[in-house]
Amino acid sequence: ARRWIARLAKGDLAPHAAAADLYAGEHWSVARRFPELSLPGETVRLWACSAGYGLIPASAPVMPYHATLTPGQADSVPGNSAAWWSELSQWPGPEPSLARSIQALVAEDPGAVFLLVLSRNYLNACGPDVAAARARISDARQLMIVSAGTRPQGALADLMIPADARLQARFGGTRRALNARIGGHLLSAGIRNAAEATEHMRQLLAEQPPVPRYDRVRQSDPEILERIAKRLDHEPGASANRLLREFRDAGLACEQHRFSRLFRTLAEARP
């Protein structure tokens, strides 16, 4: 993490953009609208849990980078993701005057409401920080975590708002953006505490149909490598995530970690 931070710190002359403008994908296209969902007299501020920069406001100037807290990807951060997150929080970052951890952000305004919209892997990385933040907040009900499909456990269990893949039938979009859509729904519905959010989401879950099951065909490593090679011949810049989505859309089965490993092996071997 220290070498990574040093690289970013030396990039002061590189082109910068606001984090919210740099981040692409459906999740961020939904999350960008969160500040528009405030109640009268309320201000909604959007922050990002960035694998490259740590906790930053969505307006922070950042350089393009390749890093993720999701394991098994070509650009996954090395080692323990929680340790990586902790190291980033010690760095002043692109906005040195602002909070660099969730704990520090909560400590600055313990009476505010905090809605954390995080995938399972990002919650694993930020978990110790969130647990420390809980001790700082005036009322634990003002701290809510939306992480669809993540099993509630440990010190954060009662902060988790019930949510799983069934809600995709209600909110639409892709599974990757489901957390953001749930977060936006809670904001637009005026729900600002965990007890109300829990009751509301349990009712929504009870109204949803079961998650569809897909009978995909498993492939051997050589078969998967052949498919990846053909796609990269046609489009060298295609990402592992994109090719995996295409692979699954074609009715084929492969775990994300396995596919990413094969993609990385092939990409490194290509001239």
What does each of the following model-derived ranges do?
Residues 186-229, 271:
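Basic, amphipathic alpha-helix used for nucleic-acid engagement in HTH/winged-helix/SANT-Myb modules
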